[in-house]
Every structure is written in structure tokens, then in C-alpha cells.
Amino acid sequence: MTDKSQAPEVDVNEQIAQRKAKLSALRDKGIAFPNDFRRDSLAADLHAEYDNLSKEELAEKGIRVKVAGRMMTRRIMGKASFATIQDMSGKIQLYVARDNLPEGYYNTEFKKWDLGDILGASGTLFITGTGELSVQVDEVRLLTKALRPLPDKFHGLSDQEMRYRQRYLDLITNEESRSTFMARSKIIDYIRRFLSDRQFLEVETPMMQAIPGGAAARPFSTHHNALDMELFLRIAPELYLKRLVVGGFEKVFEINRNFRNEGLSTRHNPEFTMLEFYWAYADYHDLMDLTEQMLRGAAESVLGSAQFTSQGVDYDFGKPFERMTVLEAIVKYMPEVSLEQLNDMNTATEIAEQVGVSVKPSWGLGKVQIEIFETVAEHRLIQPTFITAYPAEVSPLARRHDDNPFVTDRFEFFAGGRELANGFSELNDAEDQAERFREQVEQKEAGDDEAMFYDEDYVTALEHGMPPTAGQGIGIDRLVMLLTDSASIRDVLLFPHMRPKAD
């Protein structure tokens, strides 16, 4: 008899009723949810240390352990059972024999427990006849009674939307999902250590701001009752981090949430995690070098290699990353046009319309060029690539290039046809910054909801003097997607935003 064959035969509501009755009986006996069991071992650690020992070597050592976890499988074979429990690290098998437990306990207690219940067990490690490391149990306790059954073991949680809505069930039943989120944690931990080891100071800046700045995006708004003022969830921490550079914190970083009131897609979630860091006395070339080193190291640290496959595409982060300008990328993927044509407003407008871009009257040449780039080239940037020389028109916070003030000392990093990072030598000319803010206000008044607000306090900070600085933002969620072979941003967010479930 096995628990696997029982679950599909019983209606879920009936199973819940049966489990609640069992819980009621536990309450009658005393403490139904004990909290006095202390484990001393995790499944993965036991496998790592003892899997390679022979039966005889392990028996000679007489290793006693205390383990705990959720019961995922059970095979009842008369006077003995095999059960598998799952903890945060993996699974370990229990061998539960009637004669090793107090009289009557096996039949009146253990056999009445259900899959999904959380157990604590003590016993001695041994290796079964099939070679599996197991615990020969001499004490086993029910720590938490699960009132709802787990999804069918053979089919798992197959409904993709349900996996997102009930992530806890996804994590219980889907080892791949657990591995993805463990990898996410390792990636963030690596980045944090990488920057800290280079004397970057981790800081925290406001999540609610009176003026949403630092990016071109539509913000979420809220109301502060005590101050009777409108506030915005931040779209980026950039302007606050640069205030810290003005204040003398010359190398700072923050890993935190940003919020943008925009659409949902496989690449976008309104709430997302960003790394932003700022480095005084450095320029955008230094940033590209540091970013290349950091991303290569992240792949090697988490995946064990700078060469990996994601969504069927082979990537090589071990080679030097390609670098080219916005216009060079357009010409590469649209060789029938020339740099001269792209630098002429009338011709560039014609090219944009040829590729399906609807040019708005308020756009300048720089905006037209970027729209062409995003349509023609962006999705083709598969291998790691830095794109440089972004027009000043679409880069209101970036420093102008010394030799060509039409463009800025800015780059974006792409891999897999997606933008993963945006960085530039920072604009530290207060008067130029004020003028660009005014241009953004004009664009907002012309109907651009994503144009920036005028931030007078930030301009005042710049007037006190900010050293030459470079800064960058990296989308953690998209980076995790790439390094974990995930198709959707929802696969790397524990609790992605979802539409309310219909009744």
C-alpha cells in the first residue's frame, strides 16, 4: 500500500475534512503544534558527507541525526515504512519500523499521518539495499498537521498561473523552482560582496519620494495623511545616491526595489529589483570594465562557468564583451542605411517610418535614432554587448561627450536581446542639468507621461559640487532570468503581480 495511490481517489474537500478531524483529535490530546523539536542536520549536508561511504563504514561510525521536514512520499509495507521528508536543502529517506517505536505508536500515530505533514525524526544513518542513504528512525513526531493535500505528486503544480499565485506550493513540489530562487540569492550575494570588496558602501535611500526622478517612467502615487502631501513610489534611487556622492560618500551602491506604473510582460513587472552604484573619479569606460568583470564573475560563481546556455542560446561571458555605438549597431543590422543618413533628421524620420516607427512631432533627431535602434537592433544583441553614444535628448542625466555634445558618455548593456544595464558618466554641471530638467518638463507638458520632473533640490546639491562620477543601474530580475534559464520575469520573482483571480 502506498500514499501515492490513495490521493487521487479521494475528493479534495473530503481529504480536508479528514485532516481537520485528525487535527481535532490532536488538540484533544494536548499540544497540537509542538515547538520543542530541534534538528541538528540538513538533508543535503548528510548526503554530501556520507553518500560515498560503504554500508560497513557508515554502520561502524554509528552516526545519529535529528532531521525535520515535510513528508513528500511514503510507502507502507506492513510492519515498516519508507518515507521521504524534504527540508530547505533537499530530501532524506526515513525507515520507520513498528518495532523501533513505542508500542502502538506506528499504527495509531505514524500510519495516520498524511503527505504534506511536517515531521521531526531521530535515528541512525544507514544505507539501504538499493544504496540510498537513510535514517533508521527510533523517534518520529508530528510537528505540523497539514490540512490541505499537496498537488498530485506525478503531475505536480502544472497550472502556470497557479504556480505564481500559490508560490509556496510551487516551491514545495518543484525542485527547479527552488533552485532558481536559491540561484537568485547567490547572484545578489555575489554582487554585494563584489562591490563591498572594492570599498563600495551599501546604503538605503527613500522608497517614497516627493519628486520621482532618476528614470523616464510613469510613477505610482500615494498620499501621506500626516503631511497632507502627494508622494510617489520611487522609479529609481539615482538622484539620492548622487546626493550622497556630493556629501563625500564616493563609492556607494543600493540593491532595492523600484516601482514603475507600466505594463506587465515576460520582461516587465511593476515592482522590480535594481542594483545602482556610483563611483567618483571614474568614467563610463571604467564602469564597462567593472561591469564586465562583475557579470563574468557572477556567472562563474553561480554556474561554475562563464559559458552557459539559456533558453536554447549559448552564451560566452568569458570573451571580451563587444562594444559599439547606437548608430554602428543600426548600420550593422540595417546595412542599407549609412551614418550620414541617420544623422539627418528628414532621412532618419523616413527610415524610422520604414521600419514601423510612428514619429511624433515633438521628437528630435536623437529620439528618432533611438526608436530605430530599438526596432532594428536591440533584439539582435544576443551575446554580451555594450552600446554607447546615446543621444543627449534621451539621456537627461548623462554627461555630454567632449568631442560630440549631441551624444553622451552613456552605455547600455545587452544580452539575449534584452537591456540588462544602463550606465554613464554623470552630468555634474548644475546649469546644464537645470536646462535638461526644463526640457523634460516641456516634454511632459507636451504629453510625455514618462518625462522627468524638475528636481530643484537635486540641482542645488549639484551647485555645491559633485566630483566627476560614473553611475550605473543593473536589472537584477533580468540578470537572474538569463543566468537561470528562465523564460519569464515571473519565474524569478517569488510573488509576481497578478490580476485579481475571478470568482
UniProtKB/Swiss-Prot annotation:
Keywords: Aminoacyl-tRNA synthetase, ATP-binding, Cytoplasm, Ligase, Magnesium, Metal-binding, Nucleotide-binding, Protein biosynthesis. Its cofactor is Mg(2+). GO terms for biological process: lysyl-tRNA aminoacylation. It is found in: Cytoplasm. Pfam families: tRNA-synt_2, tRNA_anti-codon. Its main location: cytoplasm. Mg(2+) 2 binds at residue 419. Binds 3 Mg(2+) ions per subunit. InterPro entries: Aa-tRNA-synt_II, aa-tRNA-synth_II, aa-tRNA-synth_II/BPL/LPL, Lys-tRNA-ligase_II, Lys-tRNA-ligase_II_bac/euk, Lys-tRNA-ligase_II_N, Lys-tRNA-synth_II_C, NA-bd_OB-fold. GO terms for cellular component: cytosol. CDD domains: LysRS_core, LysRS_N. GO terms for molecular function: ATP binding; lysine-tRNA ligase activity; magnesium ion binding; tRNA binding. It comes from the Bacteria. Mg(2+) 1 binds at residues 412, 419. It catalyses: tRNA(Lys) + L-lysine + ATP = L-lysyl-tRNA(Lys) + AMP + diphosphate. It is an enzyme of class 6 (ligase). Its EC number is 6.1.1.6. Belongs to the class-II aminoacyl-tRNA synthetase family. Homodimer. PANTHER family: LYSINE--TRNA LIGASE, CHLOROPLASTIC_MITOCHONDRIAL, LYSYL-TRNA SYNTHETASE. This is Lysine--tRNA ligase. It comes from Idiomarina loihiensis (strain ATCC BAA-735 / DSM 15497 / L2-TR).
